[in-house]
Amino acid sequence: MKKMKKAVYLILFSVLTANSQVMENPNTDMSVAPVEQLALTQEWDKVFPKSDKVDHRKVTFVNRYGITLAADMYTPKDAAGKLPAIAVSGPFGAVKEQSSGLYAQQLAERGFITIAFDPSFTGESGGSPRRVASPDINTEDFSAAVDFLSVQPDVDSSRIGVLGICGWGGIAIQTAINDPRIKATVASTMYDMTRVAANGYFDTDNSAEKRNAARASLAAQRTEDYRNGSYKRAGGVVDPLPADAPQFVKDYHAYYKTPRGYHPRSGNSTDGWNVTSILPLMNFRFFEYAGELENAVMILHGEKAHSRYFGEDTFKLLCGDNKELLIVDGASHCDLYDNLDKIPMDRIAQFFSKRMPAE
């Protein structure tokens, strides 16, 4: 047994050494790798008003797959010294000009350097084809945001957190499991996108028969997309609303399809994801190692949120006394997108301050 272990370690070491030698080759140096040039809008085009308490600028950074991500950076006015930082993204299918930007700006008002970023293949970020979701690449997006924040001269690299909204709440927790640089994580009104993709809403499609039917349909769509040379879009939030739409669909419509939250770069506001984007989510499960997450997590949900079960079930998988579940009285799922009377922003800021103390 000892000989077998030694052989495995030797093989692993040789692979890692080979990779190290490749990275030392100037032809593979990240510093000379081609970087996507993004056309970024410089005017204020958010769905929320600009704060006079923070400074704002556009920034870009590159993830491990070479995709350039676009972000809005918010810095407290008259900031001095190194500050704690938070990367924000979500909801799933939204853009940084919507809910994530509001959270980022609000937290900057409370003393944090923040960025709200567009995930790969969406918004102003790079990547092709457009409107593709990937549980692997999207968790990498959050870690890439941490890469970027870690090297900023005004950021305390030992005090970096992440905040994910809706589907990006689950992605934030999954990233934190694998990235111990993330000292604290907040998942607001979270979805587990891998669960809903495989099992349907409220787990009503949780059977091999239904999943196999979905796989067959998506496989056929792949063939059709390849034949056509383009990707069929799934459509954003349904519009007009059917008379029998569930309340949570009405709530989505009230945000994404009205001046309250509509943005032309948002998939949810327009024509949605590529139909086949659901495939990798069906084939991947978050939170397999959730019990190993040592750093702090806060999960918050509205009392009336249809998505509440995602957060409560995920919370049960976490270990340690630095995990919190906060239920907001009377709030729906979408109330926690932009309703500042419902979003416990001070509690969120206090959580980050407590769990990311200055050393």
Features from the language model and the residues they span:
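Short beta-strand/loop motif that positions the catalytic acidic residue
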Residues: 293, 299-301
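N-terminal cap/lid segment of alpha/beta-hydrolase-fold proteins
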Residues: 33-81, 337
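Short beta-strand element of the alpha/beta-hydrolase
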Residues: 81-91
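Alpha/beta-hydrolase active-site loop
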Residues: 132-153
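Conserved alpha/beta-hydrolase
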Residues: 106-126
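Alpha/beta-hydrolase-fold enzymes
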Residues: 173-257
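The serine-hydrolase catalytic nucleophile loop
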Residues: 93-105, 119, 311
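Catalytic histidine-centered segment of alpha/beta-hydrolase-like enzymes
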Residues: 331-342
